[in-house]
Amino acid sequence: MSWQDKIAQGLQRRRDAAAYRTRQVNEGANGRWLQSGERQYLNFSSNDYLGLSQNDEVIAAWQQGARRYGVGSGGSGHVTGYSQPHARLEQRLADWLGYPRALLFISGYAANQAVLTALTDADDRILADKLSHASLLEAAAHSPAQLRRFQHNQPEALQNLLIKPCQGQTLVVTEGVFSMDGDSAPLAALQQQTSAAGGWLLVDDAHGIGVHGEEGRGSCWLQGVQPELLVVTFGKAFGLSGAAVLCQEPVAEYLLQYARHLIYSTAMPPAQACALQAALRQVQQGDALRQQLQQRIRQFRTAAAHLPLQLGASKTAIQPLLVGDNQQSLIWAEQLRAAGLWVTAIRPPTVPPGSARLRITLSAAHQPEDIDRLLEVLYGLCH
């Protein structure tokens, strides 16, 4: 088989399964609106949960940072790319979340890959929730450690794995809020079991940080746990991009020595770190935004419960409507778009086979009439 045949067959498999991914060129998108071509859509596919991507103070902080520091960092943080804005942001994140140290990464994907591959050896094991994000499962699979997956959000399933012998160390991996179903992990139970077995817990709280808990401190704070490793990302509630790993002092120093994604990547621009400090202030002071988001979630769920579709058991901004069939989910997404509503159809392999869905994400930027319009169109599609 030639390279051309290999590529052609792989693409055809995705087309045959109605799982072919495409990108849309948009003129601009934020928590409420998306501009594509000449048309404006109500945006129900954004992770901009608090609408901070369009916040004036955050934008001004980036502009001021760019004027002072330029638009790039110029190198890895281990060479010349680590500046005062990076150091200040790390310290403020650590103080806010109650950890001695925070380390910045260019993305949540890079952070998860770096931590799992740097910390584990061949005699270690990684026990991961089977619905963990692709970055976690891929990193675990590529790490030298043995990977075992436990049934989603089932502490008893984790316990059955923990009681089995392991020559090395055990790292349990989960998310605070799961990105496709919007449900939350039972973090207190998972931490209790992990600690009793002498293991460490890693929580990726990409979709919980900024949204849950006092000052938006996230899922772990809300459930009263402090995992040994906490990954937070800035592409959701913070409205920007990037990530940080929160940990103890020796772990941070270890990662600085061994985390290849940290060592060999150009650091985020200092201007971005300036904007993230402004976003952090908005998150900390964002109780009103979080209350607005919760109101939109309650409004949607109350009415969507009457739709002839399975509504996911989510109390978060991620509200999946399960369709099942790949092609039907695409048809409905197109019909919603024709009505001026941007909703994304999520299909395998991103989600398990037979669980194609309309993944609706809500934002504090949405207005009550936006939710009413979405529900009106959904009712029309189903009836």
UniProtKB/Swiss-Prot annotation:
Q: Which domain of life is it from?
A: Bacteria
Gene Ontology molecular function: any one = 8-amino-7-oxononanoate synthase activity
Q: What is its EC number?
A: 2.3.1.47
Q: Residues that bind pyridoxal 5'-phosphate, according to the entry?
A: 108-109, 179, 207, 233
Q: Which residues bind substrate?
A: 21, 133, 350
What are the required cofactors? Answer: pyridoxal 5'-phosphate
Annotated SUPFAM superfamilies? PLP-dependent transferases
Q: Which GO terms describe its biological process?
A: biotin biosynthetic process
Keyword match Thylakoid:
no
Question: Which enzyme class?
Answer: transferase
Q: Which reaction does it catalyse?
A: 6-carboxyhexanoyl-[ACP] + L-alanine + H(+) = (8S)-8-amino-7-oxononanoate + holo-[ACP] + CO2
Q: List residues modified as N6-(pyridoxal phosphate)lysine.
A: 236
Q: Which pathway is recorded for this entry?
A: Cofactor biosynthesis; biotin biosynthesis
Keywords annotated in UniProt: Biotin biosynthesis, Pyridoxal phosphate, Transferase
Q: How does it assemble?
A: Homodimer.
State the function annotated in the UniProt record: Catalyzes the decarboxylative condensation of pimeloyl-[acyl-carrier protein] and L-alanine to produce 8-amino-7-oxononanoate (AON), [acyl-carrier protein], and carbon dioxide.
Task: Please report which protein family the annotation says this sequence is part of.
Answer: Belongs to the class-II pyridoxal-phosphate-dependent aminotransferase family. BioF subfamily.
Q: What is this protein called?
A: 8-amino-7-oxononanoate synthase
What organism does the UniProt record list as the source? Yersinia pseudotuberculosis serotype O:1b (strain IP 31758)
Q: What is the lineage of its organism?
A: Bacteria, Pseudomonadati, Pseudomonadota, Gammaproteobacteria, Enterobacterales
Quote the gene name from the UniProt entry. Answer: bioF
